[in-house]
Amino acid sequence: MQNLGIAITGSGSAAPETSLHNEELSQLVETSDEWISTRTGIRQRRLALPTESLSSLAAAASRQAIASAGITASDIDLILLATSTPDDLFGTATKIQAELGATKAVAFDLTAACSGFVFGLVTAAQFIRTGVYQNVLLIGADILSRWVDWQDRRTCVLFGDGAGAIVLQSNQSDRLLGFALKSDGTQNHYLNLAYQGTAQEILPNIKITQGTYQPVTMNGKEVYRFAAQKVPEIIDKALFEANITVDQIDWLLLHQANQRILDTVAQRLNIPAHKVISNLANYGNTSAASIPLALDEAVREGKIKPNDIIATSGFGAGLTWGAAIFQWGR
């Protein structure tokens, strides 16, 4: 098959209308706006109502991305949904396919937690580069508010809900300049949303386990240490693969986990603060949605312009982390 280039030609985003401010969280747990904002940079987060679904947020973001790419849903060959919180554990990408009317698209979910969008970007690129598909819709979406313990101030202050989407298309020149992906399962226990079940005897001498997933648990200090060390390293590796220097980067777009992490990574890479894209003050950590949501906002605000070089990195549970260097537009 012919190897082709890829371009990111459209973006979109969606978030619930309901906002929860730091001051309101102090009614739930022992905290304050100052405590949260100084440690995380977060001031509010969006929360999905019981009537809202992951697929509805994802579809809204997708419609924007498809429109901005100048194509129709019927042009989409593949839909990749990066999420850890599907409407249906068997997968939600096909539900989005139906909502969009993308009748010819293959659709499946991809789970890599907060790294999901970057892992999905690289996965989508392989389908295009090998000539299998021409138009791919990549979505990052999560509703983690449904999976946090709202009495645990270590986690409930961090997460918000949202969705972001991009369209990738085959292109004469390759706009994905370089990437690197990593995983380390030995550190899985630092951040997880683990299954917790109870043994039940269904017949004599035959036991099964039934249960559900426990809320998000996290060792914040270890996750910070991991991100501060591994994210600059993997961005450097992706830059090497792209054969460009850090000075050529127009924008640093990291997973929006914590402002301290964003600042630390930028400092270690010697990237000035004005090149760092951050919107977590308004959305919190939206997991797989954070990068495409921030990307879309920056494009719509006129910050990111055609041909800008963007260094992006996702990192989180697994533990997983990855980086991609790409140019915006064709």
UniProtKB/Swiss-Prot annotation:
A GO CC term assigned to this protein in UniProt: cytoplasm
Location of the active site: C114, H255, N285
EC number: 2.3.1.180
InterPro entries: ACP_syn_III_C, ACP_syn_III_N, FabH, Thiolase-like
Catalytic activity reported: malonyl-[ACP] + acetyl-CoA + H(+) = 3-oxobutanoyl-[ACP] + CO2 + CoA
UniProt pathway: Lipid metabolism; fatty acid biosynthesis
Function in brief: Catalyzes the condensation reaction of fatty acid synthesis by the addition to an acyl acceptor of two carbons from malonyl-ACP. Catalyzes the first condensation reaction which initiates fatty acid synthesis and may therefore play a role in governing the total rate of fatty acid production. Possesses both acetoacetyl-ACP synthase and acetyl transacylase activities. Its substrate specificity determines the biosynthesis of branched-chain and/or straight-chain of fatty acids.
NCBIfam families linked to this entry: fabH, PRK09352.1
Entry-linked HAMAP family: FabH
Assembly and binders: Homodimer.
UniProt record similarity statement: Belongs to the thiolase-like superfamily. FabH family.
Stated name of the protein: Beta-ketoacyl-[acyl-carrier-protein] synthase III
Organism, as annotated: Trichormus variabilis (strain ATCC 29413 / PCC 7937) (Anabaena variabilis)
